[in-house]
């Protein structure tokens, strides 16, 4: 009789060529007075154009059996009586995308710098603050504001693909456009900036790619989850919209599989001979991903034969089961 034993075959020694898209959480929209849109989360990728006009970054070369950090940044908060907050950073191994800057709020208040900069708040008198900067190769600056007692218009939040629009007389600035990516096999635009509020007239629209719209009468629209879109500005003391959460997308060859720690929310898909993992939430900043692979094997499994009968008219024992195949997944 043979006892069954567990066994393990380690992955190959060669490095794993890995594409990535890492987007941080978007900044919250302003919500006191003269409110501006939040900036989009920072946008870094090896599979196409990065944010802020940056080129594609180098692919990562990773190893089997090593735990790599993965974190999805939350969107920035917003309220009706305070300036919003910046979005949180997203991380994959050595790649960190910076959270989007909060939109300005109250008289002449500047937006925050971030992955993309928040828009500048307006005022009845004075001059507009300088535009809040985005992070190089991640996102663009927010827009400036138009000053006027009953004609003000705040600045839109910057997007990964374009600056936030400046406010104009009774017109809130639009959020900057996001950037399209085909890393999952289809084109999706993410990381648009949040639209701004205005005294009357026309609020700023959210930038393409999940930016929230501003308002001239009510609350701002939140940035879309898992796009890193900036939050739209609220009117007067109405709350601005929260920033959209970020996302981390990992693309590896079809023979490589990812194993995530328990606090990771992830979906998987395949496209063009690759396995694609879209991480949409992490419960802590200590979550990890480890890579394994399929090991090609040829196998033959034969069971023991049955014993023959031991009395009159007895029959012979049956042969054991027989199975063979290849490409066993480990």
Regions found by a protein language model. Give the residues of each.
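Low-complexity, glycine/proline-biased repetitive segments and flexible coils/loops
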Residues: 1-330
